[in-house]
Amino acid sequence: MSAHQARKRFGQHFLTDESVVESIVRAIGPARDDRVVEIGPGLSALTRPLLDRIDHLTAVEIDRDLAARLRRQYPAERLTVVEADALTVDFAQFGQGLRVVGNLPYNISSPLLFHLMGAAEQVRDQHFMLQREVIDRMVAEPGSGDYSRLSVMLQARYRMEMLFDVAPEAFDPPPRVVSAVVRMAPLPADRLRPASDAAFETVVARAFSQRRKMLRRVLGDWAALTPWDELGIAPTARAEEVGVAQFIGLADALLAAGAPGLARP
């Protein structure tokens, strides 16, 4: 089968190191009847060993040439190919207990992580290859330089663990950054959760819009509605110093106080 030229517009970097592939599959630990969805299968580096261990795999691939290649390589009863941009796919359609895996396109990694939150109720776990710097932000703690909107939004929904680094030489073509593999498991239904997901997202986005400024200045007219002492947030605090639970409390308090611009559930 002819070689496929990596396409920059799709952020393609094909994993070629078999030892890394084996480490990822071992971390996933797939069982024969698992419901697995792979994003960006590319040249089948993960697809092949996954299909050695499970009965059926669903693959989401935007590149029509690679999608056609996958259909030629594997029978339809083993592999379902969804030819689409992962950012437009409703992952909830694939059922309950999903195990989502993939070497995610680095040019859309953050938007894709936010998009996948919409299907978190259907997901058992997620194992992704990403830029190491993105994973550092995902798992960052308050007060660190990597703590960001991405940290807060994902930590409110998932338990996350950085598993191991992957050198650029493991890919063709090699990316200019170090990569890593992360495990994401949705938090249980009884987790601390905001009264309104939309309000929470709006508050966090506003707070981090000027992360170096004091939060009370960034919040503007919302600051007067904020019960600072009750939330345990110093009025001089910056967004990067506020914990996930405090952000949930802040969003709920502002929503209850009728803060303008916040959507009610």
UniProtKB/Swiss-Prot annotation:
<keyword id="KW-0808">Transferase</keyword>
<dbReference type="GO" id="GO:0005829">
    <property type="term" value="C:cytosol"/>
</dbReference>
<feature type="binding site">
    <location>
        <position position="103"/>
    </location>
    <ligand>
        <name>S-adenosyl-L-methionine</name>
    </ligand>
</feature>
<dbReference type="InterPro" id="IPR020596">
    <property type="entry name" value="rRNA_Ade_Mease_Trfase_CS"/>
</dbReference>
<dbReference type="InterPro" id="IPR029063">
    <property type="entry name" value="SAM-dependent_MTases_sf"/>
</dbReference>
<keyword id="KW-0694">RNA-binding</keyword>
<keyword id="KW-0489">Methyltransferase</keyword>
<keyword id="KW-0698">rRNA processing</keyword>
<dbReference type="GO" id="GO:0003723">
    <property type="term" value="F:RNA binding"/>
</dbReference>
<dbReference type="InterPro" id="IPR020598">
    <property type="entry name" value="rRNA_Ade_methylase_Trfase_N"/>
</dbReference>
<keyword id="KW-0949">S-adenosyl-L-methionine</keyword>
<keyword id="KW-0963">Cytoplasm</keyword>
<feature type="binding site">
    <location>
        <position position="61"/>
    </location>
    <ligand>
        <name>S-adenosyl-L-methionine</name>
    </ligand>
</feature>
<feature type="binding site">
    <location>
        <position position="13"/>
    </location>
    <ligand>
        <name>S-adenosyl-L-methionine</name>
    </ligand>
</feature>
<dbReference type="InterPro" id="IPR023165">
    <property type="entry name" value="rRNA_Ade_diMease-like_C"/>
</dbReference>
<dbReference type="InterPro" id="IPR011530">
    <property type="entry name" value="rRNA_adenine_dimethylase"/>
</dbReference>
<comment type="function">
    <text>Specifically dimethylates two adjacent adenosines (A1518 and A1519) in the loop of a conserved hairpin near the 3'-end of 16S rRNA in the 30S particle. May play a critical role in biogenesis of 30S subunits.</text>
</comment>
<protein>
    <recommendedName>
        <fullName>Ribosomal RNA small subunit methyltransferase A</fullName>
        <ecNumber>2.1.1.182</ecNumber>
    </recommendedName>
</protein>
<feature type="binding site">
    <location>
        <position position="15"/>
    </location>
    <ligand>
        <name>S-adenosyl-L-methionine</name>
    </ligand>
</feature>
<feature type="binding site">
    <location>
        <position position="40"/>
    </location>
    <ligand>
        <name>S-adenosyl-L-methionine</name>
    </ligand>
</feature>
<comment type="similarity">
    <text>Belongs to the class I-like SAM-binding methyltransferase superfamily. rRNA adenine N(6)-methyltransferase family. RsmA subfamily.</text>
</comment>
<dbReference type="GO" id="GO:0052908">
    <property type="term" value="F:16S rRNA (adenine(1518)-N(6)/adenine(1519)-N(6))-dimethyltransferase activity"/>
</dbReference>
<dbReference type="Pfam" id="PF00398">
    <property type="entry name" value="RrnaAD"/>
</dbReference>
<dbReference type="InterPro" id="IPR001737">
    <property type="entry name" value="KsgA/Erm"/>
</dbReference>
<feature type="binding site">
    <location>
        <position position="85"/>
    </location>
    <ligand>
        <name>S-adenosyl-L-methionine</name>
    </ligand>
</feature>
